[in-house]
């Protein structure tokens, strides 16, 4: 499995930096020429020719210990539609533990839920597929959130939205 990561992460020092540079990481960049040529060719080779898995965290979906699914951006779905490959939808459940991790946080247990895969529809355009896949992925994550936490998803902030947080907003 390959992982897409921001190109600036490759400058990290130590063991994590070593992993970033040598553990099947694919850099993503703001450089338009790189993205249109090298990145595109790399994904095409890995997804279409070699049938590899590629992990792409959709933009702005990763917030530290934030339980709620974030409304997605189109990037990962664009490439899935472009290369006619499925999205393996996932939701990470976060359970607060009793032990402290830091002064501000309790330890958190992470449970990965693999949801139904989402396939492009061969009758639709790449554009329509990317938007439909994005919508379906969000719907699945919303449903998982509501089933796991036993409450409807809304975006009014409460302390419990941040897993393990011992603080208060008051």
Sequence positions of predicted segments:
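Non-catalytic C-terminal accessory region of glycerolipid acyltransferases
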Residues: 37-170
